[in-house]
Amino acid sequence: MSFEFIKKLPTPAEIRKELPLPAELVKIKEERDAEIRDVLTGKSNKFLVIIGPCSADNEDSVCDYVNRLARVNEQVKDKLILIPRIYTNKPRTTGEGYKGITSQPDPEKKPDFLAGLMAMRKMHIRAIQETGLTAADEMLYPENWGYVSDILSYVAIGARSVEDQQHRLTVSGFDVAAGMKNPTSGDFSVMLNSVYAAQHPHSFIYTGWEVNTHGNDLAHTVLRGATNKHGANIPNYHYEDLIRLWDMYEKMDLKNPACVIDANHSNSNKQFKEQIRITKEVMHSRKLSHDLHKLVKGVMIESYIEEGNQKVGAGCYGKSITDPCLGWEDSERLIYDIAEYE
């Protein structure tokens, strides 16, 4: 038998009973969700900035980072909505390496999913409690949605997951914003088909239940660059790429046309410092075109306290143990620069 069953994990309801979201934080999340909805539906002219570590590996340093973000948020909240990236599951290109706090609450120890589910939820709740900022996370495993459905305000569907039917159908049951990334091939039609699927109702099997969903009108596109057949990275954040996406949106029956630009990954050729220039180019493109100003609703930026990255166990506080990130000083300056464009 290929599967070795280690232990049965608590259900989402059991975990949420153990670590509930306090009533005052429920209200904060409702307000944040409504703010983000207004941006994606065009009722608000604010701009989304989804920013934070590549992976949320340590509760103290992540919450330290989000507290810094909250102080900046006070200065820019009339123009921007800052959404901290608290990514607790990490897709790995080869399946090897650190897979996030949900798998390994201690990156230097073996996986412990029970402790990981508790650590993940505790970190998200602490961040909201201390800052009032609800976060974004990536949905790597659709069956885990119940563990975080009451605490997240934004969900990303990654380039390797966006073609998967269960991801698409699960998003159709969300009531929060969901960004569907272009696949690694860069095919816009695949991404838009994913948005179409997520925006429509479905019947399917989910965690042992027959379920119906009603569609998620906040599903939208995320451009993260592509990889060609030779393994070279190809950006797709340029003006002409955005115009092409707008034209394709116009031909499809989709609600709330919206796009967020991921400034890292293949768009930056994995050169994290390029995120600064890329973000500014995107903001400039929005100024040049009324259509793009309507379409591009936000950016994603990988950022932490210390710039770059380190190996697991190296011990530098606030430095990524996965992909390299912008440091805090550059990140803070970039947020203020984004606000100046608005």
Task: Cite the ranges covered by each PLM segment.
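Conserved phosphate/anionic-ligand binding catalytic regions in large, soluble enzymes, centered on
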Residues: 48-61, 323
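Internal helix-turn-beta structural module
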Residues: 304-342
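Conserved, mostly hydrophobic/aromatic
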Residues: 52, 261, 327
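Glycine-rich phosphate/diphosphate-binding loops that line cofactor/substrate pockets in enzymes
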Residues: 37-45, 251-256
